[in-house]
Amino acid sequence: MSIVLAIDTATAAVTAGIVAFDGHDCFTLAERVTVDAKAHVERLTPNVLVALADAELAMCELDAVVVGCGPGPFTGLRVGMATAAAYGHALGIPVHGVCSLDAIGVRTTGDTLVVTDARRHEVYWARYRDGVRIAGPAVGSPTDVDPGTALTVAGSPEHAALFGLPLCEPIYPTPAGLVAAVPDWSVSPIPLVALYLRRPDAKPITADNEPIVIGTLTPADVDRCAQLESQFFDGDNPWPAAAFDRELANSYNCYVGARTADTLVGYAGITRLGHTPPFEYEVHTIAVDPAYRGRGVGRRLLGELLDFAGSGAIYLEVRTDNETAIALYRSVGFERIGLRPRYYPASGADAYLMRREAQ
C-alpha cells in the first residue's frame, strides 16, 4: 500500500489530500479543500499539513506526490507544481503530474463533459466515457464547445450550467481522482510541464529546427542552472546549485526553464513581495544560452513571469551595459526609475532599477 500526497491548484479550489493506493483502488485518508482562487499560496501548505495530521501520518511516510498540471490559470497552477516538486525533492520520492480535468473525469461514468473556468469568458474542457478521456483537453468559448454524446456535465457549476445538461460531481479535482488519473504507476514520472492550452508557450517553439519547450524548473535542474549561471554571470557572483534549490522551495517564487530535448538552455525566476494584496513582484533572473539567443526564448521566459505577476507592479535590476535586455524590458512596459552604482560587487558594474507599473 502506497501513501500518496495529492495536490491541485488548477482551479479555484486549493486541494490537498492523503490517499492510500494499493495499485488498483484509492482510499482517501484525509483531505482539505479551500475554495479561494486568490489564496493558493497562503492555503496550500497549511492544507497539506492539516491533511497529514488528520491522517495521523508524518511527511516522511509519504511514498509519492501527485499534482494537477492544468489546464488552469498561470498563477495558481505554478503554486501547486512548485510545491509538489519541492516535496518530492526534499523527500526523495517520485512526483507524478496529471491533467487536472482527468482528475475530475476519471470519477465519472457514462459520457460526460468536464469544464473548468479558463477566465476571459472561456472554459477548459474535455469529454470522457466511463472515466476515460475521449476528446480534449482544449480551451474555448462555451458556445464553441461541442458536448458531443455527453449526457452529463461535471466541473465548475457556474460554467457547467451553461450546457443545459444534468450536472454531476466532482466539481473540482479530488485527491482520489488525482491519484486515479496517473496513467501508469510502473513508469518513472517525466518532469512536470504545465498545461496552459491558451498561450503560445503551451506549444513548442523552435530554434534551428530543435523544439524548445517552456516548462517548470525543477530541483533536478539546479546543477545545470548553476553551470549556466557560471557562464552567464562570471564575475558577478553567480548562484550555486544550493541557491537555486532554496529558491525553488519557496512557494512565493515562480521559476521556469527552456529545454531542447533533455537539455536546459535557459531559465527565469520571479518572486512575490509581501503577504497581503496589492502584491508587487521582483524578477530574480533571466538567462538564455548564447547559442539560443535572438530566437525569442528570453521573451517567452519573461512572458511566463509577467503572467505569474498578473496585474501587479514588477521590479528588476539590469546591468547598464546590457542593451539587449534593457530593450526587451522596455518593450513590455518597464521603465528606468533609478541607478544602483556598483550593484554587482564582483565586477563593479552599475545597474538600472526598472519598474513595470501595475496593470
UniProtKB/Swiss-Prot annotation:
MF term (GO), any: protein-N-terminal-alanine acetyltransferase activity
One of the GO biological process terms: tRNA threonylcarbamoyladenosine modification
* Pfam families the record matches: Acetyltransf_1, TsaD
Occurrences of domain N-acetyltransferase (ranges): 212-359
- Which cysteine pairs make disulfide bonds? none
Among InterPro entries, the record links this protein to: AcTrfase_RimI/Ard1, Acyl_CoA_acyltransferase, ATPase_NBD, Gcp-like_dom, GNAT_dom, MshD_Acetyltransferase, T6A_TsaB
UniProt-listed PROSITE patterns: GNAT
What this protein is called in its record is: Uncharacterized protein ML0378
